[in-house]
């Protein structure tokens, strides 16, 4: 008989799932979403883009290789809660420094196991991502459903200020420095900074609310707009700063949330997807050619293609639902992708987009 205390996941539409608590025995509310990656749970947990969300893993066994410091994408886990079919009791990897359960307890992350995750994922797929409450304290289903309904929705929710750096800092180049880039930290992952560093880029990471004038005063070779959590429609002041960067003709590369903010700076609209794209197996097609990339995603919003101005070209589309996955300005050195070219976790098909950014900066230097 299990010694783990009972826990309940209650969704705002009244659906409930009873299982067992296996980490911190607390209570949290957030948007319930699912991730289809088979591995990479540590990178998922520490991705700031998951702030405000309870993440369900579709793979049935999670935690077997433990946790280490090196693979974290930030200094702490950002998920509100974590849901799995079965949490591994065995930690078997030479790089492991602690078990997943111990790691989650250390950070007071509430986690649930022993539910039918297939049923939960099908429900989210059919009904959409929604508010939920996960508790090992309150076991009254009606009470938890009401708490879920009272929690803040993801629409119009601003979370970048929660995850961004409080002070600017430099991430040095791994080799001879070729370029200096300023990164707007909306929730940046370490592997993005590493990808730039490997290409000879020194990156100055600045808070999400940094003014464009302050960035331009640094005379950067380029600007990187990072991934991050929340609704891009809540970031009006940041979008206004990005507009100033666009008119300054500095090379810009946006990914994920940064891609959405760039779209809004171009005058386009963004909208909420039914259940989003989260996982390492999303097929993306290059519009101008025949190339297809298998890509890593983590987003619940997308840019509305029909609202983009004529000077912005859609470069990539999702083969599953035809969402805009990439853009470029026809005359300015500006590109973006909706997915995560740095992967972590995920395939490496899209790493070349960092090289595209390097080439934009090279060409701009020659022009100047």
Go through each PLM region and give its residues.
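RNA-binding accessory domains that recognize and position tRNA/RNA substrates
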Residues: 1-213, 217-218, 232, 344-349, ...
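Flexible loop residues that form catalytic
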Residues: 87, 228, 301, 332, ...
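Proline-centered loop/turn at the N-terminus of a beta-strand
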Residues: 110, 180, 251-253, 269, ...
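Active-site-proximal beta-strand elements of phosphoester/diester hydrolases
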Residues: 180-185, 295-296, 335-339
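Cysteine-nucleophile active-site neighborhood
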Residues: 221-222, 226-297, 302, 346-364
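Catalytic beta-strand/loop cores that center a nucleophilic Ser/Cys/Thr
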Residues: 291-332, 368
């Amino acid at each position: 008989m299990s010694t783990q205390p009972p826990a309940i996941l209650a969704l705002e539409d009244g659906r409930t799932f009873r299982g067992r608590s296996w980490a911190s025995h607390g209570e949290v509310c957030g948007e319930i979403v699912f991730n289809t990656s088979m591995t990479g749970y540590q990178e998922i947990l520490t991705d700031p883009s998951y702030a405000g969300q309870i993440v369900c893993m579709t793979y049935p066994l999670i935690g077997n290789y433990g946790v280490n410091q090196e693979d974290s994408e930030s200094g702490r886990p950002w998920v509100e809660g974590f849901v799995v079919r079965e949490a591994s009791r065995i930690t078997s990897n030479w790089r492991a420094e602690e078990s997943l359960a111990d790691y989650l307890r250390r950070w007071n992350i509430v986690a649930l196991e022993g539910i039918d995750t297939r049923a939960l994922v099908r429900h989210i797929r059919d009904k959409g991502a929604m508010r939920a409450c996960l508790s090992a304290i309150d076991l009254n289903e009606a009470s938890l459903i009401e708490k879920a309904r009272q929690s803040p929705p993801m629409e119009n929710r601003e979370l970048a200020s929660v995850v961004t750096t409080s002070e600017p800092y430099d991430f040095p180049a791994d080799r001879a420095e070729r370029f200096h880039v300023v990164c707007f930290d909306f929730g940046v992952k370490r592997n993005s900074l590493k990808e730039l560093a490997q290409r000879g880029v020194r990156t100055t990471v600045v808070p999400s609310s940094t003014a464009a004038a302050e960035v331009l005063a640094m005379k950067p070779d380029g600007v990187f707009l990072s991934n991050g959590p929340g609704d891009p429609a809540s970031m009006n002041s940041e979008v206004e700063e990005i507009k100033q960067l666009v008119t300054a003709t500095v090379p810009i590369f946006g990914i994920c949330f940064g891609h959405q903010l760039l779209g809004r700076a171009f005058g386009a609209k963004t909208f909420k997807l039914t259940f989003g794209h989260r996982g390492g197996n999303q097929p993306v097609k290059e519009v101008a050619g025949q190339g297809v990339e298998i890509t890593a995603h983590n987003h619940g919003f997308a840019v509305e293609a029909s609202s983009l101005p004529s000077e912005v070209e859609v470069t990539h589309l999702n083969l599953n639902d035809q969402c805009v996955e990439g853009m470029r300005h026809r005359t300015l050195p500006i590109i973006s992708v909706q997915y995560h070219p740095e992967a972590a976790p995920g395939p490496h098909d899209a790493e070349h987009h960092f090289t595209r950014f390097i080439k934009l900066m090279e060409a701009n230097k020659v022009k100047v």
